[in-house]
């Protein structure tokens, strides 16, 4: 297993890279989120990797963060989601955005990704529910699902509301609202529905 590559970036052609590591050039496919953060050609680069072995090829996928790689690994476990589709998902939205879409059960956000239809989006929501942990949903420097929103969601579920109802109510709560105030506002939104 090749878990990490450190070398010189020789070639960039989205989504493909060529990284020279002590005279050996590794072809690596990366999500666009990683691609946009790469250094210039000729500069050193370090990527976390995932090797996929198929009958006809050995494919190497690279990631700029452990959260991206972990999410990729979770995605390829899902029936009907191969490495290319997983790469498309990670290119279409950041890990925190994906975690938020999963937490709030927003299939519509997933269907905006090329190649993801309604059924695939619903399968992603079902299979990834509870699997994108705090380290994935709260990558430093990126917007994520606030802890308070997750707590409000859990409180509404504990009160017997469906996930769909709870997610819709949470959308009515302004970002940055505390848990107790968030629950009050969500319950108010639910009473009007």
UniProtKB/Swiss-Prot annotation:
Q: Which SUPFAM superfamilies match?
A: DNA helicase RuvA subunit, C-terminal domain (SSF46929), Nucleic acid-binding proteins (SSF50249), RuvA domain 2-like (SSF47781)
Report the source organism. Cupriavidus taiwanensis (strain DSM 17343 / BCRC 17206 / CCUG 44338 / CIP 107171 / LMG 19424 / R1) (Ralstonia taiwanensis (strain LMG 19424))
Region (Domain III) residue ranges read: 151-193
Cellular localization per UniProt: Cytoplasm
Region feature Flexible linker, mapped onto this chain: 144-151
Oligomeric state and partners? Homotetramer. Forms an RuvA(8)-RuvB(12)-Holliday junction (HJ) complex. HJ DNA is sandwiched between 2 RuvA tetramers; dsDNA enters through RuvA and exits via RuvB. An RuvB hexamer assembles on each DNA strand where it exits the tetramer. Each RuvB hexamer is contacted by two RuvA subunits (via domain III) on 2 adjacent RuvB subunits; this complex drives branch migration. In the full resolvosome a probable DNA-RuvA(4)-RuvB(12)-RuvC(2) complex forms which resolves the HJ.
Q: Where is this region: Domain I?
A: 1-64
Report which residue ranges the record marks as coiled coil: none
SMART domains registered for this protein in UniProt = HhH1 (SM00278)
List, alphabetically, the GO terms of the cellular component aspect.
Answer: cytoplasm; Holliday junction helicase complex; Holliday junction resolvase complex
- Assign the protein's first listed, main location to one coarse class: cytoplasm
InterPro entries associated with the record: DNA_helicase_Holl-junc_RuvA_I, Hlx-hairpin-Hlx_DNA-bd_motif, NA-bd_OB-fold, RuvA, RuvA_2-like, RuvA_C, RuvA_C_sf
Q: Where is this region: Domain II?
A: 65-143
Show the domain comment: Has three domains with a flexible linker between the domains II and III and assumes an 'L' shape. Domain III is highly mobile and contacts RuvB.
Family indicated by similarity: Belongs to the RuvA family.
Q: What's the stated role of this polypeptide?
A: The RuvA-RuvB-RuvC complex processes Holliday junction (HJ) DNA during genetic recombination and DNA repair, while the RuvA-RuvB complex plays an important role in the rescue of blocked DNA replication forks via replication fork reversal (RFR). RuvA specifically binds to HJ cruciform DNA, conferring on it an open structure. The RuvB hexamer acts as an ATP-dependent pump, pulling dsDNA into and through the RuvAB complex. HJ branch migration allows RuvC to scan DNA until it finds its consensus sequence, where it cleaves and resolves the cruciform DNA.
Protein name (Swiss-Prot/TrEMBL)? Holliday junction branch migration complex subunit RuvA
GO-annotated biological processes = DNA recombination; DNA repair
Q: Which UniProt keywords apply?
A: Cytoplasm, DNA damage, DNA recombination, DNA repair, DNA-binding
User: Which Pfam families does this one have?
Assistant: HHH_5, RuvA_C, RuvA_N
Q: Which GO terms describe its molecular function?
A: ATP binding; four-way junction DNA binding; four-way junction helicase activity
Presence of keyword Magnesium:
no
